[in-house]
C-alpha cells in the first residue's frame, strides 16, 4: 500500500505512523519525509497481509494519541513493489537550476519538461536569500536527442534567468553520494 500523511509538525509523528504500520504487522519498504514551513509530509510504501485493508490502516492511524492529528490517505498499489524497484529508467538525468527568486520558476521548468514529454520523477526546491534552487530527477527515456534538450534548456535558462546543469543520474550519484561504512 502507499500511504500519504500530512500534519502540523511535532515530535513523534514518524514513530506514530510507523508504529501503526508495525502494529498491523506491516513491512515498511520505502519512506520519504520532509518538513516544510512547520508542516510534515510523508509518503510511505508498506506491505501487509492480504486481510489488511486501506480502511484498517486509516483506522489504526486515526487512533494515535496526540493533540495534533494528521491527515492520511491510503491506497493499494497496482504493481508489486519488487517489480517497481526493478524499473528505474536507464535515461534518468538530474537537472539543477538556480537563480534569483521570481514567480513562475517551477511552472516554467515543469512546463518545459511537459512540452517535451519529460517525466519529473522527483523535485526539490529551496528559497534562501532571495535565491531559488530546484533539483529535478528526470526520466528522459522518450527523448531521442539529449543534445536538443540541452540546447532548448540553455535557451529556456537564459530567458528565465537561471543557471542550469543537466547530468546523467549515474554521474550525479558518483559526485554527490554520501556513503555509510
What is the predicted role of each segment?
Residues 1-181:
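A conserved regulatory-domain signal marking ACT and ACT-like small-molecule sensing domains
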Amino acid at each position: 500500500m502507499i500511504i500519504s500523511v500530512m500534519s502540523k509538525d511535532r515530535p513523534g509523528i514518524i514513530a506514530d505512523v510507523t508504529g501503526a504500520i508495525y502494529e498491523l504487522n506491516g513491512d515498511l519498504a520505502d519512506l520519504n519525509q520532509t518538513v516544510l514551513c512547520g508542516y510534515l509530509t510523508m509518503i510511505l510504501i508498506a506491505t501487509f497481509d492480504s486481510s489488511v485493508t486501506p480502511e484498517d490502516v486509516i483506522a489504526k492511524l486515526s487512533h494515535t494519541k496526540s493533540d495534533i492529528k494528521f491527515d492520511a490517505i491510503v491506497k493499494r498499489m497496482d504493481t508489486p513493489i519488487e517489480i517497481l524497484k526493478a524499473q528505474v529508467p536507464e535515461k534518468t538525468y538530474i537537472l539543477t537550476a538556480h537563480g534569483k527568486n521570481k514567480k513562475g520558476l517551477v511552472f516554467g521548468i515543469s512546463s518545459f519538461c511537459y512540452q517535451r514529454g519529460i517525466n519529473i520523477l522527483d523535485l526539490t526546491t529551496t528559497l534562501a536569500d532571495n535565491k531559488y534552487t530546484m533539483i529535478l530527477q528526470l526520466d528522459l527515456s522518450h527523448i531521442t536527442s539529449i543534445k536538443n534538450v540541452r540546447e532548448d534548456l540553455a535557451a529556456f535558462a537564459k530567458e528565465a534567468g537561471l543557471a542550469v546543469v543537466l547530468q546523467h543520474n549515474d554521474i550525479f550519484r558518483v559526485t554527490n553520494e554520501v556513503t555509510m561504512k
